Each structure stands twice: as structure tokens, then as C-alpha cells.
A protein has these predicted regions:
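Disulfide-stabilized, aromatic/cysteine-rich ligand-recognition loop
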Residues: 33, 249-252, 272-319
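A short, hydrophobic C-terminal helix/tail in secreted or cell-surface proteins
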Residues: 321-339
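Active-site microenvironments of metalloenzymes and redox enzymes
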Residues: 54, 61-178, 184-210, 272
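N-terminal secretory signal peptides that target proteins for export/translocation
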Residues: 1-11, 345-346
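GGW-centered surface loops in extracellular recognition modules
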Residues: 33-51, 164-166, 170-175
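Short, well-ordered junction/capping motifs at the entry into regular secondary structure
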Residues: 121, 163-168, 212-215, 221-260
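Bacterial N-terminal signal peptides
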Residues: 15-26
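N-terminal signal peptide c-region/cleavage motif recognized by signal peptidases
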Residues: 28-30
Length: 346
């Protein structure tokens, strides 16, 4: 036992002095850390739909709402405090296009060069490629702040075009696979053989198009069979526009919002490397409800960017917020140090 305690003491000292210290350094929590509303998609091992999509072996989490302009501003100001736009994470159309939601001011102080445009902070970010979304996943994986955008969930190597890499084993944040996205949107839930809805509003009937007020809040609120499509949301002088997340009708069975209409959302297809990535859900100007339905999907170049593409991320079940896992590691460090001292005295 004495020999075991001495060995454990040595191990604890190594963990404390090297491993945990390094981990705590890499997971330093920024002052304005982004927090995310996650929902759990349970019923693991569910059957696929007749479309062949939707079967997922394990429970997972997915964002309740699409990634917004305000959250993307936090990302930009963290990873590009000086405004040099590494790896083209900022598309200038975000500022120049009326439907874009983010401005850039070169003369602003470092860390505040990007800002959400008036009434656009709570709208889904657009003009983002798959590469941009993957860099957000890496940013979260690395504890936010000024951490690397090139490693973590995905190994990107400063690429902005070409084949998209596979998601890395052990990723904590990632683009959902197509099956995960499909299940979160259309599965009825409650068992492994519950079946599927045609639309992500828990309905087999085409949604009614929402309208919008002068600040872009959807007319439907968070209930009912509605969606933002067929240019129904006319505001800010536009014939169809993005609207405030969560105000465009009812949720899916797993309590996700805006997975029918609003913005085409990137997905990772199978998660393997490839020359294309998927998108589902339709968008604010989809001329037919078919684009919003479970029968519609598209495969596109990962570098595509326009006012119709956005994203939401997924994660394994019970991934803590950055502050939580940083505190947990701090506890591990203190616990390891305490154990080492007790062992040393033994």
C-alpha cells in the first residue's frame, strides 16, 4: 500500500504540475463567454424514416436556436481582435447586404471591431460557409477566447476551400450529421419507433408563412404551424428577410426552433471527409413548402456563402459550458495537489 501511495503521489504531482495546468491554460474562460441553449435528442437507436434518413444510434444535443449574428460577433471579436480577417471568417456582405447582420469598423478598438447591425443581433447569421461554422466549433472546443480555430473538432489547416475534413474523434462541438439534423427536426420522439413528421413544426401540413414587424420579429411567436418562407417576412425594405430566432412558429418534438424555413442550415452529411456538405430546412424565400420538408435536402460546396446559409451546432450529451469544465479542472487540480500532499506525508 505504501508503494502504491507513493506511486499515486508521483502521478498526482505530474498531473498537477503539467497536465492540469496546461488544460486550465487552454480552457481559460473569456469575460463574455457565449452560452448556448442545448436540447437533448434522445430515443437512441430509433428507426430511420422512409426517406432512409433519421436513424441515430446515440443520444446527442443540438442547439435550440440557430447561431445568431450576436454570437458570431462574439466569435469574430475573440479570434480577430485586430480586424485582419484570418481565413476569411468575415464576409463583407454581412455588412454591405441589407440581410447581412454584422458591421466592421476598422478604426474601432481591438476586440470591438465587429458589431451586430441594428435589429439584427437576434437574427440567424448568414453569409457563412461550412468552413466558418467548423471554425466556430473549434473555437468552442478550445474554450472560446482567442484560442485556435484550426484544431479541435476539425483539423482545418487554414483551408477555406477544397474537401471538408472529417470531424475528429472526441469532438465536443460539431456540425450535426444529416441523420442527427433530420432526427432533431422531424422525429416524433417518445420511443424508437415513433415515426416522423413532414415538417419541423410537428405537422404533416405545410406551414403558414409568417410575417414580421418593423424590427424583424416573426408574427407567430413560438407556437403554431408557421415558418419563415415564401418571402412572407417583409421588413427593413426587403421582400422576404431573416427574422428573430424562435419567433416563427412551433418547435420540433425535441424543442428546436426554425428548422423549417428561416435559413438553410449546414450539416456534416455522414461526418466523413468529402467534397460536399449538406444543407436542410429551406429558407426565408423558399417558394414551396417542399424545401422545408423532410423530403428536401441539398449537397453543396463547403465554401459556399450567401444570405441563405446558416448553422446550428451539435454536441455529445451533457457537455458543460466552458466555465463549468474549467471549474471542474480546477477542482481536479486542487484535488490532485491535496492528494499528493497527503500521500507525501504518509
Amino acid at each position: 500500500m505504501k508503494r502504491f501511495m507513493v506511486s499515486f503521489a508521483r502521478l498526482s504531482r505530474v498531473v498537477f504540475s503539467v497536465g492540469v495546468a496546461a488544460l486550465l491554460g487552454s480552457l481559460a474562460v473569456p469575460a463574455h463567454a457565449v452560452t448556448i441553449d442545448w436540447v437533448t435528442v434522445g430515443d437512441p437507436g430509433n428507426a430511420a424514416d422512409t426517406t432512409t434518413y433519421g436513424a441515430v444510434a446515440d443520444a446527442f444535443q443540438i442547439m435550440k436556436y440557430e447561431w445568431t449574428n450576436s454570437r458570431y460577433v462574439d466569435f469574430l471579436n475573440a479570434v480577430d481582435a485586430s480586424g485582419t480577417n484570418p481565413n476569411s471568417v468575415y464576409n463583407t456582405n454581412m455588412g454591405s447586404d441589407v440581410r447581412g447582420g454584422i458591421s466592421f469598423t476598422s478604426g474601432a478598438s481591438p476586440g470591438s471591431k465587429y458589431a451586430a447591425k441594428t435589429d439584427m443581433g437576434d437574427k440567424p447569421v448568414n453569409f457563412v460557409s461550412w468552413w466558418d461554422a467548423a471554425r466556430v466549433a473549434n473555437w468552442l472546443q478550445n474554450g472560446q477566447g482567442s484560442g485556435s480555430t484550426e484544431t479541435g473538432a476539425y483539423t482545418l489547416n487554414n483551408n477555406t476551400s477544397g474537401n471538408a475534413p472529417a470531424v475528429n474523434v472526441g469532438a465536443l462541438f460539431y456540425l450535426p450529421t444529416e441523420n442527427q439534423w433530420y432526427k432533431a427536426a422531424y422525429y416524433k420522439g417518445g420511443s424508437t419507433s415513433a415515426g416522423y413528421w413532414d415538417y419541423a413544426t410537428q405537422s404533416d401540413t405545410a406551414p403558414t408563412a409568417v410575417t414580421a414587424g418593423t424590427t424583424g420579429i416573426g408574427s407567430a411567436g413560438s407556437a403554431g404551424n408557421f415558418a419563415n418562407y415564401i418571402d412572407g417576412a417583409d421588413w427593413n425594405g426587403q421582400n422576404g428577410n431573416v427574422t428573430t430566432v424562435g419567433t416563427n412558429g412551433g418547435s420540433s418534438a425535441y424543442d428546436t426552433f426554425d428548422m423549417s424555413g428561416s435559413i438553410w442550415e449546414w450539416n456534416d452529411l455522414t461526418g466523413a471527409a468529402g467534397s460536399t456538405r449538406g444543407a436542410r430546412g429551406g429558407y426565408w424565400s423558399s417558394f414551396s413548402a417542399f424545401s422545408l420538408s423532410s423530403s428536401s435536402n441539398i449537397a453543396i460546396d463547403p465554401s459556399d456563402e450567401s444570405d441563405v446559409y446558416g448553422f446550428r451546432l451539435a454536441s455529445p450529451v451533457a457537455v458543460p459550458e466552458p466555465a463549468t469544465y474549467a471549474m471542474a479542472l480546477a477542482g481536479l487540480a486542487c484535488g490532485g495537489f491535496s492528494m499528493w500532499r497527503r500521500c507525501k506525508r504518509a
